[in-house]
Swiss-Prot record:
NCBIfam families: rplP_bact. SUPFAM superfamilies: Ribosomal protein L16p/L10e. Belongs to the universal ribosomal protein uL16 family. Pfam families: Ribosomal_L16. It comes from Phytoplasma mali (strain AT). This is Large ribosomal subunit protein uL16. One of its GO terms (biological process) is translation. It comes from the Bacteria.
Length: 140
């Protein structure tokens, strides 16, 4: 699973995913990319599930770039615990994704466009947000 090796604070404030992304909105590495159409938190398990779906479909002929990383820890208190007495233990790690961010990029060594599009489609089904598949150079 993806998670930071070390953080400055164990329990940071929750970051907002509202609004548009300021940078990282262009496809740089691959031929096709998966762009977020709405904002949300994406957990490290969801990122890993999308990565596995893409790499299994592409096999050894393709390359996958992951442009998001779960830096933010979300805390949760145990069940049936009274209010107060602290914030709770870090439960999961999430990446803050805003609208317009490029999440994944793929390129196939055999130049099989069908395989690239299918890999991104499979990955999009593993994510909790609406996404759009875009070709390099065609996004605004």
């Amino acid at each position: 699973m993806l998670m930071p090796k070390r953080t400055k604070y164990r329990r940071p404030h929750r970051l907002s995913y509202e609004g548009k992304v300021k940078g990282k909105n262009l496809i740089v590495n691959g031929n096709y990319g998966l762009i977020a159409q709405e904002g949300n938190w994406i957990t490290n398990k969801q990122i890993e599930a999308a990565r596995i779906a893409m790499t299994r479909h592409m096999k050894r002929t393709g390359k996958v770039w992951i442009n998001i990383f779960p830096h933010l820890s979300l805390t949760r208190k145990p069940l049936e615990v009274r209010m107060g007495s602290g914030k709770g233990a870090p439960e999961e790690w999430v990446a803050v994704v805003k609208k317009g961010k490029v999440l994944f990029e793929v390129s196939d060594l055999n130049n099989s466009v069908k395989a690239e599009l299918e890999a991104l489609r499979l990955a999009s089904h593993k994510l909790p947000i609406k996404t759009k598949i875009v070709k390099k150079g065609e996004q605004k």
